[in-house]
Amino acid sequence: MGSYAVLRNRDFLVYLIGRFVASLGQQMLSVAVDWELYERTHSALALGFVGLSQMIPMVACTLPAGHVADNFSRKRIILMMSLVLALASFGLTFISAVNAPVPWIYLCLVVIGAARTFLWPASSAFLPHLVPRSLFARAVTFSSGTFQLSSVAGPAVCGALIAIMSRHHSHPAALIYALNGIASLACFGLVSLIRREHIVAAKQPLSVTNLGAGFRFVFENKIILGTITLDMLAVLLGGATSLLPIYAKEILGSGASGLGLLRASMPIGAVACALVLTHRRPLQKAGRAMLWSVAVFGLATIAFGFSKWFWLSFALLAVCGAVDNISVVVRHSLVQLLTPDEKRGRVSAVNSLFIGTSNELGGAESGFVAQLFGRTMGNPVSTGAVISVVSGGIGTILVVIAVALIWPQIRKYGRLDGA
């Protein structure tokens, strides 16, 4: 089949466009919230509460979200959560326009975090119903690529709109929130056009046993457990993005404009990788490809840690984004293909919990190590940042070796297209 055969699937194409529109709006909202909170409070702690306000509902709602995704129409869950996201976004619009107290912003973010927690497992588990198994890996590649594209376009569009609106409007963030609300409504309209439906064979009662079925399945399936563990620890140890402001100002001397480019470099690399993957045959040794991609991620992270040249640093982060995209495609494909449909929602919820918390904790870990080996020990802050990034890259490589030895099934896994 051709590289773009999956796009001839009407339902998948509608799903893909809806995902891009929704992701674009969410990326814009994330930037706008950070900008408005800092403008109003000038507090780094206020920015820290943004992640916390979305992480708390994710941890609290993960198990119920997985159970709901396995026992109710996944399409309807996506539609309902899109409406909730739209309402929360319009709530932020009002709060920003009237300059309401900051805690109201956090309340809306808690609602958004809860809606996303229910949306993710339903959306992930719904995708296998839209395409045949032979095209699923390509579908995941396109889905990942559109998300990364929104990660590049969203902040850029948001920044440009805020810069323009700031000259003529006292509440530019309100416009961004309204646009995200419209994007969520557009996603609702697009998903409602999808003809295929997830049919629940038999609803399972809400119980501790059924809620924990996703965790039990993950820990019983060695390949899924190994892939989730690999990605979780790699993100926890190898993430350099939280320290990019230090690199841009103290090490590379590139300032705010350079910081913007550095933040865009990983999504750019991921999009480029997605384009390459769509034009080549499916991975023949998916397990080995994932292990090697994470190992290269660690090596590129180490090299970035030592780099003092801006464009070399940009290129190394782009490499990180590219190989991370390979890992994401393989992991997501394995999780969905190896999980029975009646458990896909709960397993997807567990997957999102591990990855989501590792993203948040990874930033905290990087900052803690940088502070410990920087100012706490009397060294420049740049020294602490370099030690944090390089040690994280080394830790990532050690994780790859450990996973390959503990779960040899991953090394032996072949094609993702079911052939």
Spell out what each predicted region is.
Residues M1-A419:
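Alpha-helical transmembrane-bundle signature of multi-pass membrane transport and export proteins
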